[in-house]
């Protein structure tokens, strides 16, 4: 796994605006995607993730014009997802300036597309997004966990967290690695928008089950939550939205805090680091 930990702001986009919700529901406006992307890039974000969160549910492609506008104002790696079902969708996203393509619903419905994307664009371009939620109806063949006296397993959800699949998240993570995914974007639906910390049980379980990089997502409300996920799991990157969108914390200040607490992060923007070489 990579030594330097990455901090990744996330732009969840609906109707051309950045939004944020709670458990994938109760969506509210959080700003302009182009302005926020530029701000995060300048503050030293390592990468940016842009997710068109209603594309799959609405059975349409990602808003390409907006992807192009965001790509023009940043100089950091850029992952885009939402509504990717066929290779042409991925090609269009990459041609608009994205460096990586994230696929979730499309991969569950047609797992072979992961291999096809890897063969066509390279493993480094393929990010499989896994949205997982606790299911307390335990059954044979699932990875069972216990917390607060209750047993559960992690179920994969699709269509923006609206539909359960019956897939065990840990087993699905192993499968997507086998099929050729270069990275996993792992989001806890239970923790999404709560601002009370990442799901350490889910994150550690998936990280320990695969060899490819994993990005932790869902629940970050303060810098200490990032510190916790880096100290208590071997996750490669921490993604956050709320703490950055509402200006309670800036990317550079969060990274300074992590550095002060012995987490190896890259300080300074990509542009400023390049200027020093």
Regions found by a protein language model. Name each.
Residues 74, 78-100, 201-238:
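Catalytic cores of alpha/beta
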Residues 12, 40, 48, 80, ...:
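Conserved, mostly hydrophobic/aromatic
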Residues 61-68, 111, 166-170, 196-204:
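Charged helix-capping and loop-helix junction motifs
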Residues 47-66, 105, 185-196:
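Glycine-rich, proline-tolerant flexible connector loops at the mouths of alpha/beta enzymes
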Residues 63-125:
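Glycine/small-residue-rich loop that forms an oxyanion/phosphate-binding "nest" at active or ligand-binding sites
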Residues 113-120, 230-269:
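C-terminal helical cap(s) of enzyme catalytic domains, especially alpha/beta-barrels
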Residues 6-10, 47, 75-79, 100-102, ...:
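Structural preference for beta-strand elements that scaffold enzyme active sites
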């Amino acid at each position: 796994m990579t030594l330097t930990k990455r901090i990744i702001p996330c732009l969840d986009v609906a109707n051309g605006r950045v939004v944020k919700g709670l458990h994938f529901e109760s969506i509210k406006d959080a700003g302009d995607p182009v302005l926020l992307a530029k701000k995060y890039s300048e503050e030293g974000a390592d990468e940016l993730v842009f997710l068109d969160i209603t594309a799959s549910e609405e059975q349409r492609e990602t808003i390409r014009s907006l992807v192009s506008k965001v790509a023009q104002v940043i100089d950091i790696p850029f992952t885009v997802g939402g509504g990717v079902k066929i290779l042409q969708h991925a090609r269009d996203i990459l041609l608009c300036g994205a460096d990586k393509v994230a696929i979730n619903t499309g991969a569950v419905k047609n797992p072979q597309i992961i291999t096809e994307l890897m063969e066509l664009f390279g493993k480094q371009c393929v990010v499989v997004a896994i949205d997982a939620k606790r299911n307390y109806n335990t059954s044979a063949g699932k990875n069972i966990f216990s917390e607060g006296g209750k047993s559960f397993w992690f179920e994969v959800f699709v269509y923006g967290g609206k539909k359960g699949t019956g897939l065990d998240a840990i087993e699905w993570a192993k499968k997507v690695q086998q099929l050729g995914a270069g990275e996993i974007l792992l989001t806890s639906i239970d923790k999404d928008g709560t601002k009370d910390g990442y799901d350490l049980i889910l994150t550690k379980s998936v990280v320990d089950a695969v060899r490819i990089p994993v990005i932790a997502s869902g629940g970050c409300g303060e810098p200490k939550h990032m510190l916790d996920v880096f100290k208590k799991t071997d996750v490669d990157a921490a993604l956050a939205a709320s703490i950055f969108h509402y200006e309670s914390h800036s990317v550079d200040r969060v990274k300074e805090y992590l550095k002060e607490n012995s987490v190896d992060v890259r300080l300074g923007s990509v542009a400023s680091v390049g200027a020093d070489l």
